[in-house]
Amino acid sequence: MWLLALCLVGLAGAQRGGGGPGGGAPGGPGLGLGSLGEERFPVVNTAYGRVRGVRRELNNEILGPVVQFLGVPYATPPLGARRFQPPEAPASWPGVRNATTLPPACPQNLHGALPAIMLPVWFTDNLEAAATYVQNQSEDCLYLNLYVPTEDGPLTKKRDEATLNPPDTDIRDSGKKPVMLFLHGGSYMEGTGNMFDGSVLAAYGNVIVATLNYRLGVLGFLSTGDQAAKGNYGLLDQIQALRWLSENIAHFGGDPERITIFGSGAGASCVNLLILSHHSEGLFQKAIAQSGTAISSWSVNYQPLKYTRLLAAKVGCDREDSTEAVECLRRKSSRELVDQDVQPARYHIAFGPVVDGDVVPDDPEILMQQGEFLNYDMLIGVNQGEGLKFVEDSAESEDGVSASAFDFTVSNFVDNLYGYPEGKDVLRETIKFMYTDWADRDNGEMRRKTLLALFTDHQWVAPAVATAKLHADYQSPVYFYTFYHHCQAEGRPEWADAAHGDELPYVFGVPMVGATDLFPCNFSKNDVMLSAVVMTYWTNFAKTGDPNQPVPQDTKFIHTKPNRFEEVVWSKFNSKEKQYLHIGLKPRVRDNYRANKVAFWLELVPHLHNLHTELFTTTTRLPPYATRWPPRTPGPGTSGTRRPPPPATLPPESDIDLGPRAYDRFPGDSRDYSTELSVTVAVGASLLFLNILAFAALYYKRDRRQELRCRRLSPPGGSGSGVPGGGPLLPTAGRELPPEEELVSLQLKRGGGVGADPAEALRPACPPDYTLALRRAPDDVPLLAPGALTLLPSGLGPPPPPPPPSLHPFGPFPPPPPTATSHNNTLPHPHSTTRV
């Protein structure tokens, strides 16, 4: 009898396991959630082998258990010759791989000189706790962490009780669950996905949450501007992780057709860049950008070669040939490379995403204007006081900021972002005027408040609003929020608002399980309620693309007080009203967030910058850094002009500054001041005339852009674009060109003569967009090297042969004929180092 009973138990176990060690029938969809909930160490089949996870209980009675799969490889380790290369798919492994402990973090220098102003406040305020998450570092760091719920979360149960309807198949365990992949921030230099436990978000929202490690700093973003080191390896790691999820997440009960990427800070910038990249097309459907976009000054590196040369010089790899230099860098230890102090210009980055013509095909704002992100639903927002770390250094005491400190901070801000001598005075005084509370101008606390608003508006608010507007211009779904709450923590100034990164504990449900080492807050019931609200919005968006559906806001099971969010309907953002949701203890839907200040940065400041360029065309500007790796000896035939093209050589070795960037001084002013009065009158009259012309051009350009948008949205019948995302077609024989393309074609023909500048031939006749003009700087640098090769769409294997010359937005532009004074003419739009 006992033998019969044993056989029956074994048969029942085999049926419960689905006939295989992975918990799913061979060839079936994968592990059933019932098996996940019953086994302590469940095993799942993937395309590369079996992985064993661990079931964990959460410290909250309303949350069910979660199975964690920690350290699942999504790519081959980028070691040896694979350093500075796109990631490859992981190799298969025999047997069962344990996925029960966190993987190593990617190499980084947590105690380096990276400016704290760009890091989240919880990171800098708890640096010792953050260091414990990155003590175990290795170049073999390309791993995912998966958090899979084992039963329906409280949102599903609450919905069923409230509506008395049958369970919604979209959010029950009988259907595939939405997937949310989190991209961590840290200025592309620091951080790890291990810091973010997705268990509460997964259990409460009934979604699968994934975090990942991707290559950082020099190992993730070093670029020489040519095929020796193309850059953007960190972005390609994220794309490879998305490929892995699309291929394998069904085995864990996830839906590969409902993948949402979300991130904060630099992670949000990566979200924005992945939206614009054709490499990630079809790999995800929705995106959430928390406190970051691709058009902030710190989002994209427009001087990659400059910092690569500085690093190479520091470690003894300063070679004349870029390939030799990269090979030398490959032979160095990761620790030696990461520990080098290569300081970026303030408000910028030394190693980060670059416009390579492939992964990032063009300037992100140009791609947005072309409608390259039409296929994605988007949720984007900012925190009330993002710029806290910018102001703390200027706050001399609890009494606020003195008048002299205010003036110095604004001057330093203008110097670091714009750098030109005469025009900065006008811009500096204009900024001071706009951010002075004239009703209480002598109040130090008010000066501190307006200074905080200045940095928040410039670095976060204006770029976020511009991004949302560009998205909404094409009638694509976008929701905008502002976050107005932060937890009570020691060391936080009483005057501080919700700073950079303060939304993260609420997104990941930390208040529901209590304080952690990274978030040592005194969480109240209000914090728990607000966290439930945020998780409901975020997971609703992942399920349907609408944060209001399918689960209504209701937290009576958490808080005895009524939830004010129950009566709020989060409206879509549109280009006219610009509606947004105020997320705080007193929620409300409003419109036109900080409209005056946003218009100041997006409209007036670029206009002032353009006026300066026109007025001071006689100013000789120093040559910028090149974008290709050139020999250190200057080429023959180089001659100076009023507006010199980017040279083919770097300054002499003695001119390379290995320390923090310092802007070079311009030649002295040689104007004749004997007739100051007449010159002043003449300049004043000229300014008036130029203002009239500029504003007339502005209104004309707005009308013109609206007309072009209508043409993009309503193409002529029978003429498909043939370009993903609605990009422009190439002029081809036998096809009638639209007026704007015909104009560019005529310019190309007209500029093809001997001695013509190809860069001028490729430049559109219409004036540059004001928000693009805002990013002009004295050391403008075009980015795409003429010899750059495209990456394979899969990111695997050797590069393909060079494609034929093309102006396709996803391919490289044809290089100019080599000359002694040739420079990078490969982009149709100029790029710069300074952004909104």
Curated annotation (Swiss-Prot):
Biased composition (Polar residues): 824-836
Organism for this UniProt entry: Rattus norvegicus (Rat)
Expression sites (tissue/organ): Detected on hippocampus neurons, especially at inhibitory synapses. Detected in retina, in the outer and inner plexiform layer. Detected in pancreas, in islet of Langerhans beta cells (at protein level). Expressed in brain, spinal cord and dorsal root ganglion. Detected in brain, and at lower levels in pancreas islet beta cells.
Residues bearing carbohydrate: 98, 136, 522
Organism lineage string: Eukaryota, Metazoa, Chordata, Craniata, Vertebrata
Extracellular topological intervals: 15-678
Protein name in the entry: Neuroligin-2
Keywords tagged on the record: Cell adhesion, Cell membrane, Cell projection, Disulfide bond, Glycoprotein, Membrane, Phosphoprotein, Postsynaptic cell membrane, Signal, Synapse, Transmembrane, Transmembrane helix
Modified residues (Phosphoserine): 714, 719
Function: Transmembrane scaffolding protein involved in cell-cell interactions via its interactions with neurexin family members. Mediates cell-cell interactions both in neurons and in other types of cells, such as Langerhans beta cells. Plays a role in synapse function and synaptic signal transmission, especially via gamma-aminobutyric acid receptors (GABA(A) receptors). Functions by recruiting and clustering synaptic proteins. Promotes clustering of postsynaptic GABRG2 and GPHN. Promotes clustering of postsynaptic LHFPL4.
Segments on the Cytoplasmic side according to the record's topology features: 700-836
Family statement drawn from the similarity comment of this UniProt entry: Belongs to the type-B carboxylesterase/lipase family.
Residue ranges with Gly residues bias: 717-728
Entry's transmembrane regions: 679-699
Major localization class: membrane
GO BP term (any one): inhibitory synapse assembly
GO cellular component: axon; cell surface; dendrite; dendritic shaft; dopaminergic synapse; excitatory synapse; GABA-ergic synapse; glycinergic synapse
